[in-house]
A protein has these predicted regions:
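Non-heme iron-sulfur electron-transfer modules
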Residues: 1-23, 66
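Surface-exposed acidic, glycine/proline-enriched linker/cap segments
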Residues: 17-36
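Amphipathic alpha-helical scaffolding segments comprising HEAT/armadillo-like alpha-solenoid repeats
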Residues: 25-29, 59-74
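Short coil turns that connect the paired helices of HEAT/ARM alpha-solenoid repeats
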Residues: 34-38, 72-80
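Conserved hydrophobic register position within alpha-solenoid helical repeats
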Residues: 47, 85-86
Length: 91
């Protein structure tokens, strides 16, 4: 089904690259995609959770990269994003 096909801008992306997207990039890259319905804040929250889970088994270098990315969202305007970033940093 075409609605479930991979979209340009999403397939093959690393979590860190997706987490770095601005709201404009999120909106631009999810045009026509059902993922757009969750909104930018939930997008960031979900990726923060994924990064926290990835952090558990990450190498020291990858943990540094993950932590650096998470820190960029530590003061996000959304409380839910801030809470999940804080959780992810403790994993």
């Amino acid at each position: 089904l075409p609605d479930f096909d991979e979209r340009d801008g999403l397939s093959g992306q690393h979590l860190l690259a997706l987490f770095a997207w601005s709201e404009y990039e999120f909106l631009h890259n999810t045009v026509g995609s059902p993922i757009r319905r969750i909104g930018y804040g939930r997008w960031l929250r979900n990726i923060a959770v994924a990064l926290g889970n990835a952090r558990r088994d990450a190498s020291s270098d990858d943990k540094i990269r993950i932590d650096t990315a998470l820190q960029t969202r530590a003061n996000h305007t959304s409380e839910i994003v801030r809470e999940h970033v804080a959780w992810a940093l403790l994993q």
